[in-house]
Amino acid sequence: MFSTSDQVSKMNSRILSALLILGIATCVIAGGFCPKSRHPQCNLSYKINDCCAQSDCRVGSVCCVEGCGNVCRAESDTPLGEKFVDGSECKHGHVFPKKWYQFW
């Protein structure tokens, strides 16, 4: 037969396992926020995209939309900037605006 201490031990290990899984899931989902944009306005006639997905950035960084293109920035605790949405239209590198004759 099981003693009361064995039952308590099993219950404690289940609770700790559940808390561990919850903690890991929270870290994976949290993702972080973009800090305030350094350059909200861009004086260039083109953009330079360093990232086109969150996976393009290192751990602890987030792909953020800036005035002159998307860049990887260190995560912030507060949502002050604009985070790039995975799946949005994006092209890596220098992106020039279309000329009038390229729209057709």
From Swiss-Prot:
Superkingdom, natural source: Eukaryota
InterPro entries found in the cross-reference section: Elafin-like_sf
Signal peptide interval: 1-30
Organism, as annotated: Lycosa singoriensis (Wolf spider)
GO biological process per UniProt: defense response to bacterium
Tagged with keyword Signal: yes
GO molecular function: toxin activity
Lineage of origin: Eukaryota, Metazoa, Ecdysozoa, Arthropoda, Chelicerata
Subcellular compartments: Secreted
Functional summary from the UniProt entry: Has antibacterial activity.
Annotated WAP domain residues: 31-76
Record-annotated disulphide pairs: C34-C64, C42-C68, C51-C63, C52-C90, C57-C72
Family in the record: Belongs to the venom protein 11 family. 02 (wap-2) subfamily.
Record-given protein name: U20-lycotoxin-Ls1a
Keywords, in A-Z order: Antibiotic, Antimicrobial, Disulfide bond, Secreted, Signal, Toxin
Tissue distribution: Expressed by the venom gland.
Post-translational modification remark: Contains 5 disulfide bonds.
Main location: secreted
Gene Ontology CC terms: extracellular region
